[in-house]
Amino acid sequence: MKKPVVAIVGRPNVGKSTLFNRIIGERIAIVEDTPGVTRDRLYSEAEWQGKVFDLIDTGGLEFSEDLITTKVREQIEKAINEADLILFVCDSREGITSTDEAVAKNLRKSDKPVILVANKVDDYLNPPANFYDLYRLGLGEPFPVSAANGTNVGDLLDLVISKLNFPEDYEDENPVVKIAVVGRPNVGKSSLVNALLGEERVVVSDIPGTTRDAIDTPMWYQGKPYLLIDTAGMRRKSRIEEDLERYSVNRSIKAIRRADVALLVISAEEGVTEQDKKIAGLIHEYGRGVIIVVNKWDLIEKDAKTADRYKEHIYFELGFLKYAPVIFVSAKTGQRLNKLMELVDRVSFEHQKRVATSILNQVLREAVVLNPPPADRGRPLKIYYATQIETKPPTFALFVNDAELMHFSYLRYLENVFRQNFGFEGTTLKFVLRERGRTT
């Protein structure tokens, strides 16, 4: 039995994301005074009284003909269908609007249990005058809270728990592979996530930057759990002026750091850009598993050698990621998405691979005999032995006589030898030099 699902819905700027963040205890949804800053469904696991449930934060409901608004409304309808319980958040200071009335009408039709949450009540013994208008929505007694300062949120969670059915034993028996989907704006990240999920869960538009939040979306593929992190497209920080966009960029960086495997999405039409290089550098720096995903491959005129030429172009521009596999896909047509998930499994396995010390040192000795390390000012570098000290990424300690004698080119040689013998496809390798109790 799966965990129960609670969805937070309401019109823009009533405090849904603030309540979401208050419940889960982290700043995951972007909170801003600008209406409509949460466009997509955000998923997070929440716990109260030892009970675990999934919490969904949705974009603000607005009933207009605007393209993004229409798509957001579709997202919310899907969230309502998925939810076991709905928290309908209203602004107790502003009172009822026509949008509130329209949302309430839809919720009454849904036949789902609803808690009407009256937000922005700092003193629930003396609520704002407009608080009492909320009774007119026909959804029962408004529950007063202040998401900003936490007033009455604990009591709200008590009520939530009382209305949910929980499995007797919930065990996370399968480790979850965390996948960050990263890239510049409008290269098809959201379309790729939706294609993998088989539904439109992330707002997709031709307008660059329509995904503002890093959205954690659970999925199952061939009986295994994954967590997809669809990040806001990263722009150069120098071009970002609004606090909202700057926070989105920082969130994208955090998404890379949280991931096991990063999918670097590149547009087949545009090729590798300077911004792609910067994002690739972040993935490499943080030591994540990485797959280079060339999207929109269906739009390219091809011959028998097009893919090989394109791969050469990628490795020329991203020379430091030559260990990363390249796959050509189309989120629009679904081309090679099964192969992509197979690659994710393979890179995840390599990212956490561990090599026995005895085998590692046998390969190391052969490498040193075949190509001895160069001497520096007459002093030879001696490598005594190696051992693997970490995974995610695989990290090796090399015990030497003098760490300053190790040239970066020889470390690169050893890295290539380790890859030839042990694989490590799609993952950074790191080396730590140790000598006489010192670490460098």
Curated annotation (Swiss-Prot):
GO biological process, one term: ribosome biogenesis
Keywords carried by this UniProt record: GTP-binding, Nucleotide-binding, Repeat, Ribosome biogenesis
All residue ranges annotated as the EngA-type G domain in the record: 4-168, 177-352
Binding site for GTP 1: 10-17, 57-61, 119-122
Residues at which GTP 2 binds: 183-190, 230-234, 295-298
One GO MF term attached to the UniProt entry: GTP binding
Superkingdom classification of source: Bacteria
SUPFAM superfamilies the record matches: P-loop containing nucleoside triphosphate hydrolases (SSF52540)
Keyword Ribonucleoprotein in record: no
UniProt domain KH-like: residue ranges: 353-437
Keyword GTP-binding recorded: yes
Segments crossing the lipid bilayer: none
The family this protein is said to belong to: Belongs to the TRAFAC class TrmE-Era-EngA-EngB-Septin-like GTPase superfamily. EngA (Der) GTPase family.
Physiological role: GTPase that plays an essential role in the late steps of ribosome biogenesis.
Protein name: GTPase Der
Organism: Carboxydothermus hydrogenoformans (strain ATCC BAA-161 / DSM 6008 / Z-2901)
Gene name of the encoded protein: der
